[in-house]
Amino acid sequence: MKKSPTDGFVDIHHHLIYGLDDGAQTWEQTQQMLTRAGENGIRRIIATPHAEPGMRPFPMRELMERIRQAREWCIQQGMQLEILPGCEIFYTPQTVRMLRDGLIPTLAESEFVLVEFLPTVPYRELRSAAKALTAAGYMPIFAHIERYRCLRWPGRVRKLKRDFSVCMQMNADTICRKHSFFSQRWVNAVIQKGYVDFAATDSHNVTSRACRMRACYRELQQRFGEQTAERLCIVNPAEIQ
């Protein structure tokens, strides 16, 4: 069933769980980020602390305990905000094995996995990661695709989607900000062509990297139409559960 804006936004990329990465550092900061998310009309968040397979152990127990703490606080505050577990995986050769062994979580216990790379990642490594993840039965979502320089070459985003069914996530702040001529043209093109599947906040705090989902929705609505705004902020993200 089609979602409407009244159902609320779904944010699949959010660093609100304190003490696990470079996002929220304290319980008070988590509370502030939850409040900001609610003010932005978000009704479901997938918590995505950084995971670095083979480089450091993932704090699964702490993640689940602090998600439970955040859920209880939201109930006490009367906030209708669902919080689900996940992570943002820095792709390494150990990623598939650690996913299979349950050492790092998928998004909301689904087959979707949020994966990031260095901005200078070669295109062949993106293809290799996509191939390995899909062969193992996962649905890769490449996080903040605007950062990867190799994807600025014509046709490369399309080929990844065609060959491996990779989903693409763009940060809300990227959609809201103005860019240089060629960067703006690329951002507009990948959205207009339907290559971007998710808009997400990648929020780390309430100041320099704050949640801007409502502003992102308005920007998409004004520049690309209501259908695109709903698809990126509501409909597609709601399928991950």
Which stretches of residues belong to each language-model region?
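An N-terminally biased module of ancient metal coordination in phosphate/nucleic-acid-related enzymes
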Residues: 1-79
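Active-site beta-loop-alpha junctions enriched in small/polar residues
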Residues: 15-17, 50-51, 86-90, 118-120, ...
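Extended substrate/RNA-proximal surfaces in nucleic-acid metabolism proteins
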Residues: 57-169
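Mid-to-C-terminal alpha-helical segments outside catalytic/metal-binding sites
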Residues: 213, 217-241
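Non-catalytic positions within long, well-ordered alpha-helices that form the structural scaffold/packing
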Residues: 38, 134, 191-192
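Short acidic/histidine-rich active-site segments
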Residues: 195-211
